[in-house]
Amino acid sequence: MFTSNTKEDLAQMLAEIGVKSFDELLPVPQVLLKGNLNLPSALNEQELTAEVKKIASKNKPLVNFAGGGMQEHFVPAAVNALSTRGEFLTAYTPYQAEASQGTLQAIYEYQSCICALFDMDISNASHYDGATALAEACLAATHLKNNKTILYTKALQPNYTEVLKTYFKNASVNLKEVPLNADGTTDLKQLETLLKNGAAAFILQTPNYFGCLESAEEISSLVHANNALLIANVNPTSLGILQTPGSYDADFAVAEGQGLGNVLNYGGPTLGIFTCKKQFVRSISGRLCGMAKDKDGKRAFVLTLQAREQHIRRERAASNICSNQALCALNATIYLTLLGPEGLKEVALKSLENAHYLRTELCKNAGFALKYKAPFYNEFVVMTKAPAAKLIKAAAKKGFL
């Protein structure tokens, strides 16, 4: 019910502000445009399409070899065709279960796919991006262990490190970096020393930022022996052929899911994958979709365990995260379902083979040498005799990024 302000109410508020009228509160600026805007005449749809194509033709499409960030994978046409159907496409979180069964089922299927892929017990409905998912896992770890120290490998994606620093700037969380060995992997002796000083968790990234594969099982044993939690940050496509986080007993496993059926974009949405062991489910952030029965005994999907969340517990919530990337998660679900285990294995093998072929061909040239000797998946670091900036500029002229 809306009750409007009376004239007396308005007069009292204006007097408190120090003005006599509403017009005086919002004065129109004296400097106004005089004359017509210098704009071309309007175009019809056909003319506008031609003009936009002309502008877009100035872009130079490059063959993408750039590493250290988002990854470009082929997205089947069926992904977009299915994800834009009205039964699934949504602009917001489906609180009203009876009117949102399509969206809720899609989220449930996403969680099921991710749990199977990561070999983990629980997946939430997704976070905003991989960096957010990692920060939320760290936040949960500090609460679970009642310890404000988080260790992370120096080979963690630098953007993620910056997000962690921003997240915990005013939260008294102590972030400590673990150095690397000469082969580009985490120094386990240094890690053990830091763990013995006490820590809530260690962040392992494998493949790491430099493409190197870490000794996940050995690191997991070391972390757990020192009463800390293991947070694994992984490349989801690599799980088609590499060890899953569940297989080496990770407590939390997170990832950037952009490569699963989502196209590259500059500044647009990506997909934060977040998984954990079942005993931590009441300490994590984000939506959780569960399967239930309605009053007639029929299968139904609902948001569950909402007592963890901000709209219920307010300042006592596990986090202030109160939404998810439903469309990106839907794309990932359709992509994984279309490919299946064998299809994802093929994607992973192709990525592995292409990267190793590129390494071999590059290193035949005397101007290139592999920097790290550790095994790698689909990215690697090379050293060059010529300045890197000069090479990048020359490659762009030839059509390569």
Language model region names:
Residues 29-109:
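N-terminal entrance/gating region of PLP-dependent enzymes' catalytic architecture
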Residues 86-97, 113-120, 145-146, 168-176, ...:
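Gly-rich Lys/Arg/Thr-decorated short loops/hinges at beta-loop-alpha junctions or inter-strand turns
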